[in-house]
Amino acid sequence: MQDEQIARVCHEVNRAYCEALGDSSQPRWEDAPQWQRESALHGVRLHRAGEAGPRASHEAWMAEKLAQGWTWRPEKDALRKEHPCMVPFEALPREQQAKDFIFAAVVRALLSL
């Protein structure tokens, strides 16, 4: 599979997981802003390049966000570039840590096809 196809699947799996947690704010892949699609694609490429664990995946995601000017706030606001997950992996709630485990598992599964 191509990286963009894998990123799309990862995005949709994450969207479904968020909905299961009561968060319906995630758009479908087709409606997602470019920065969100690029973030998923960056994550796929990180995992394709080697065995990146959940912690490394989160750290790479956070470094990308910091470079783009994102900061921590308790509520996500994409227009203001504020996100509650802008904390070290260990400080994330378990349900947020799970996203990194799920993302890695989906990438590995699709790369093995």
Where are these regions (language model features)?
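Alpha-helical propensity feature that highlights long, continuous alpha-helices across diverse contexts
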Residues: 1-113
